[in-house]
From Swiss-Prot:
Keyword Transferase: yes
EC class of the enzyme, as a word: transferase
Any GO molecular function: protein kinase activity
Post-translational modifications: Autophosphorylated.
Binding locations of ATP: L19, G20, K21, G22, G23, E24, G25, A26, V27, K39
Active-site residues, record numbering mapped to chain: D141
Origin: domain of life: Bacteria
Function statement: Probable serine/threonine kinase.
EC number(s) on file: 2.7.-.-
PROSITE patterns in the record: PROTEIN_KINASE_DOM (PS50011)
Protein keywords: ATP-binding, Kinase, Nucleotide-binding, Phosphoprotein, Transferase
Chain ranges of the Protein kinase domain: 13-300
Species the sequence originates in: Escherichia coli O157:H7
Protein name: Protein kinase YegI
């Protein structure tokens, strides 16, 4: 039986079941207060820490307790004794935040959560920081393990006893930190002992957490190196402001990993906030505050729209195309559509009727385009003193004749007087030939450029309103029709393939349960694990030799260590033939085919209407390009005339 403890006001507190233990202390249920828990230190903290906890407990309010596991009361071994722990709200029904932002974890634990849910989580993270900052305090040790999130998107900050607390002017410092969440300007500090943190330091960690949540757990300073000394260590890249997604990332030396979510998915003002947070300007003029993030993310939440193909594809309204569909097509799945809410095609779609519209569409007449032949410009004369080509040929013939004549000089010495004449003719001919060649080269290049510009405009106009564009669009629609007709057979083949690939799929799903973050791999610590995660390597299922080696810092030795870890996971796999094909897998195939049918039928319906109107709208589409084409034709005619003068 655990001893009874006392609050500062003398209330009895009896610790119950142990919920967890760390290096500093252990957390217990409290028999008397079911909604609170007790953190008991292994050894009584120093007097300053006791004062800090007493101040925190005395200043707890509803706002803090809503977002933070904040001390509610100090705990003592006896009435009036030393502080040996504290009471705080019980955090239940919540998991570490990486379970949400990690695509692999989320697919298993939160399969129904789409990007709008993640956006709300990011907003609530910012709100938790804003609450701490409004009370004059600083989180200090920002890291992913300090944030718990529930299925309602509510975020709670834990480990509040490590915060930097301003107790009416007395600062209780936060003297710990995680390197890959430490801002660039603090990376060179040997330790945080005696160092005062600021809200702007917190704002770096806040922006990093928001980036993690919105961009699938990627680290903003992890990417593909563009210079030799980049990518060796995450801490070094942070210190040098090597923000891989920056607008000027070529100069910084890192670019985003392959197949990552593009930053352009966000509106420009939110992009700019990340740029401010992760580059030098955030140190000089301050990073976006927690309040600014709350406002920006709340506004973004009001501008979302859903993809017509998948109910799980939610994205910002300024985009014309679904970014998740684009990533799906690259083989990168961030959100699983379980097939329960796929938008189906309306029942009035009849392929024969739509195709009849296509076949009834009338092609546009031949376009009357400005031609170079319509212009008769005068070619520019050659520069003064430059001989035409035929005169240069005559000089070359004369030079050849005089060369033959000189062969007889030994026999006829009196012809020696012709040598200076021959030399003069040779010099004049040589110089004239070089200048002529430069001039003709210049005119030929001008002609080629003019022809390229003219041909490009002709092609544009033909595609917009000519027969070529009409035929190309009809061919594209015919391909869609053929795809629709082939869908039943495609679905049949896909369902049959489930049996052929059953073993590999079971093995893949098995390996997806082994997370690198939780693994003990020699030489692969938290920073290297963050780098792997930025390249989409989260579980044993993601590991390939080629994939690991593309991450800077993973040479043969470390790569082999990761491969060996994967092999150790694979050895535990046992195939279950009785579960070769599950109903959920069959449903997923049929849902995928239904989504494809909807996409094709919608596109064909719209395309058929556009083709019917192609002839009608052709003049309006081509008219803006007619004057530029006339000018291009005139320019080409002039270039042709100039070239003919050579």
């Amino acid at each position: 039986m655990k001893p009874t403890l006392y609050t500062a006001t003398g209330e009895c507190v009896t610790p119950g079941r142990e919920l967890g233990k760390g290096g500093e202390g252990a957390v217990y249920d409290i028999n008397e207060f079911v909604d609170s828990v007790a953190k008991i230190y292994h050894t009584p903290p120093p007097a300053l820490k006791q004062d800090k906890l007493a101040f925190m407990a005395a200043t707890a309010d509803a706002q803090l307790l809503n977002y933070v596991a904040w001390p509610q009361a100090t705990l003592h071994g006896g009435r009036g004794g030393k502080v040996i722990g504290f009471m705080m709200p019980k955090v239940s029904g919540k998991e570490p935040i990486h379970m949400i932002y990690s695509p692999a974890h989320r697919r298993q634990s939160y399969p129904h959560c789409a990007w709008d849910f993640l956006l709300y989580v990011a907003r609530n993270i910012a709100s938790s920081f804003a609450t701490v900052h409004e009370h004059g305090h600083v989180v200090g040790d920002v890291n992913q393990n300090s944030f718990m999130v529930g299925r309602d998107s509510k975020v709670v900050l834990i480990d509040s006893d490590s915060f930097q607390i301003n107790a009416n002017g007395t600062l209780h410092l936060c003297e710990v930190g995680v390197s890959h969440f430490t801002p660039p300007e603090l990376q060179t500090l040997p330790s945080f002992v005696g160092f005062e943190r600021t809200a702007n330091h917190d704002n770096f960690g806040l922006a990093l957490l928001i980036f993690h949540v919105l961009f699938g757990g990627r680290h903003p300073y992890s990417g593909v190196p563009l210079i030799s000394d980049a990518g060796n260590a995450l801490e070094t890249d942070i210190a040098h402001f090597r923000y891989a997604y920056a607008s000027d990332n070529q100069r910084r030396g890192l670019k985003p990993p392959p197949r990552s979510i593009p930053l352009s998915m966000l509106p420009g003002d939110v992009e700019a906030m990340f740029q401010q947070a992760f580059t030098e300007s955030g140190v000089a003029t301050a990073r976006p505050t927690a309040k600014a993030w709350v406002a920006a993310l709340d506004l973004l939440r009001q501008q979302l729209k859903k993809c017509t193909v998948s109910a799980m594809h939610v994205y910002p309204g300024h985009l014309t195309d679904c970014p998740w569909c684009a990533l799906d097509n690259q083989g990168v799945i961030y959100f699983i559509d379980l097939g329960e809410e796929v938008i189906t095609t309306s029942g009035d779609f009849v392929l024969a009727k739509v195709w009849a519209m296509v076949m009834a569409s009338v092609a546009p007449p031949a376009l009357q385009l400005p031609l170079p032949d319509h212009f008769q410009p005068t070619g520019r004369p050659l520069p003064l003193g430059l001989l035409r080509r035929e005169y240069i040929i005559l000089i070359e013939i004369a030079l050849s004749a005089l060369s033959l004549l000189l062969c007889g000089l030994q026999a006829e010495p009196r012809y020696i007087i012709l040598v200076p004449v021959l030399a003069a003719i040779w010099i004049i001919g040589s110089l004239t030939s070089k200048v002529y060649k430069a001039e003709i080269q210049q005119r030929r290049e001008a002609f080629n450029r003019a022809k390229m510009d003219y041909d490009h405009l002709v092609s544009q106009i033909q595609q917009l309103g000519g027969l070529e564009g009409f035929i190309a669009k009809r061919a594209m629609l015919e391909k869609m029709k053929d795809e629709i007709l082939g869908l039943p057979e495609e679905e049949k083949r896909a369902l049959a393939a489930l049996h052929d690939t059953a073993r590999e799929r079971q093995k893949q799903k098995f390996l997806e349960g082994f997370f690198i973050d939780a693994a003990s791999i020699p030489g692969v610590g938290p920073a290297r694990k963050a780098a792997l995660r930025s390249f989409g390597i989260e579980t044993a299922a993601d590991v390939t030799r080629r994939g690991v080696k593309q991450v800077k810092g993973f040479g043969d030795h470390l790569t082999q260590a990761v491969i060996d870890w994967k092999a150790s996971c694979e050895r535990r796999f046992v195939f279950r033939p009785n579960e070769a094909v599950t109903p959920a897998e069959r449903q997923a195939v049929m849902a995928k085919m239904a989504a494809k049918r909807h996409r094709l039928e919608s596109a064909l319906t719209v395309g058929a209407t556009e083709l019917q109107r192609f002839r009608l709208h052709a003049p309006a589409r081509t008219m803006p390009l007619m004057e530029p084409l006339r000018q291009a034709a005139e320019k080409l005619a002039q270039a042709q005339a100039d070239l003919s003068r050579c």
